[in-house]
Structures are given as structure tokens and as C-alpha cells.
Amino acid sequence: MLPTLDARLTAAAQLVRPGQPVADIGCDHGKLTAVLAASGRYPKVIGADLRPGPLAKAKQTLENAGCLDRAELRLGDGLSVLSAGEVGSIVLAGVSAQTTWEIIEKAPWVSAVGGPRLVMVPATRHSELRRWLWQHGFALVADRPVQAAGRWYAVMAAEYTGEVTEPTFTQCLLGDTGRWPEGAGYA
């Protein structure tokens, strides 16, 4: 049985580039990994986590969804489980903004024009993640406020352009949420 995603993971899945391999870093329970693998829209789906326990849960989720044969699970720290050019999108959901940018900093190949799309759902400090992305040459190609379990999350997609920007406080706080109808209650 295919797992049900909450609103934030559903929004993240919608921002993954179709037709290209994808990695779900910090896959935890493997729900997003399973939904991506079952969709048939990606030639390769990789679920990775730092600890064996979550990977065992992810394996069980994939087995229950009937798509274990369409995903690959890897044990490792952040993006060290990937090689440059291996995926077109990387999902980083459920970790803090600081952890997100620390993961990105450890993989310089991500900061290259034409590199992978980063799909991020920071658990905390989304405004600081926006600032970090802009100050390090990334452009936000999507930025959506999503409510799940009674709280608001920022679901973002960024691609490296090399163009460094110094954003305002308001840009960091709200991003592009003014473009989305659900943005009214976001801040």
C-alpha cells in the first residue's frame, strides 16, 4: 500500500524534476522515497539516511508499497552518498536550515551551474535558509507556504546560478509567498 504524504511532502514531491534521477536525503520512514519510486516518473530514486534504523523503516515502507525494486537505499552522511551528476533533484526535508546548508556546503558539486535542483523543507529558520541560498549563488525557482499538522512550512526549490544576491529582511522572511493564496496566514 502506497503511503500517504502530508501537505509539505506532497508539495516537495511536486517540485522534483521529472524524468531525472532523484535523491531523498534523510529519507527517514521512506514515505517520500516510496511515492517517488511508485510514480514511475524518475529513472532512479535513491533514499539515504545517516542511521540504519530509519533505512530499515524505509525498506519496509518500500516493500509495503510494492516498489522496493524501483528504489535504492544508501547509508551515509548527507550528500556523501551521491556522486556529482548522479541526480537531477535532491530533496532535503525535515532538518533545520543550518543542517541543510551544512549538507550543501560539504558537496561543492551542488554549487555548479546546471547542477541538481535542491528541494528543501526546513523544519526551522526558513528565512535564514533563503538568505544563505541567495548569498551563495542560488535562485529560488519555487517557494511555497504549506500548512501541515497545524504549523506552516516553507517548501522551496533552488538552483545554482552563481548570481549572489543580498536580500532584504522581508524577502528572507516571506520569500515569494505573496504569489500563493495560502500565503496570507504564513508570516
Question: What feature does the model see in each segment?
Answer:
Residues 39-41, 63-69, 110-113:
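Short helix-capping segments at alpha-helix termini
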Residues 44-49:
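Conserved SAM-binding motif I beta-strand of class I
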Residues 86-94:
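Short SAM/SAH-binding signature in class I
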